[in-house]
């Protein structure tokens, strides 16, 4: 059994509701958005508005994302985005579907896709590609993460204290987490 668990805010809330973690002990870790990775050397088109996002997606020669059936949040969100933009058929014709968002980013980094969809924290600092940007409203999806001790004891206290340290905050910032998750 782990001393501490770090999962999405939604999962922490379920664990608290089930009595597996104490709600008052939950600490927000940060938030990450869903966005696009662009392969190094590929055009960096703007995606700050729905029209710009649509144009960038249509202009890309290939795009990788997590198959929505795998349960990946970014993949499910992207399926809704391309449906709403009216370009689902065009995107599926040039899709490289993978199981997880990080695999989409890795495929982009290897040159197997011009763009990739994933959580921004899975894009930042990946070789061969970089973050083009987060999806604009109304397509933005932000996921919060939180930590909670699963058991009482010195190890759990030490881990929770470390998670609250300036060094860990700097490391989380460096990989794209925005400060403060919800504390369900």
Regions inferred by a protein language model and the residue ranges of each:
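Exported/periplasmic ABC-transporter solute-binding proteins
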Residues: 1-3, 8-32, 38-184
């Amino acid at each position: 059994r782990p001393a501490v668990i770090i999962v999405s805010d939604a999962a922490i809330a379920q664990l608290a509701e089930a009595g597996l973690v104490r709600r008052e002990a939950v600490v927000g870790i940060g938030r990450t958005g869903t966005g696009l990775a662009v392969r190094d050397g590929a055009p960096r088109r703007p995606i700050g508005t729905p029209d710009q996002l649509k144009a960038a997606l249509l202009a890309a020669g290939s795009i990788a994302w997590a198959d929505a059936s795998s349960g990946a949040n970014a993949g499910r969100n992207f399926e809704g985005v391309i449906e709403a933009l009216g370009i689902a058929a065009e995107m599926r014709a040039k899709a490289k579907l993978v199981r997880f968002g990080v695999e989409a980013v890795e495929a982009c980094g290897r040159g197997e896709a011009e763009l990739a969809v994933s959580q921004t924290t899975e894009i930042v600092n990946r070789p061969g590609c970089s973050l083009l940007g987060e999806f604009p409203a109304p397509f933005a999806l932000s996921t919060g993460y939180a930590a909670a001790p699963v058991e009482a004891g010195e190890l759990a206290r030490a881990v929770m204290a470390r998670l609250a340290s300036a060094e860990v905050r700097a490391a989380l910032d460096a990989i794209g987490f925005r400060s403060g998750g919800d504390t369900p």
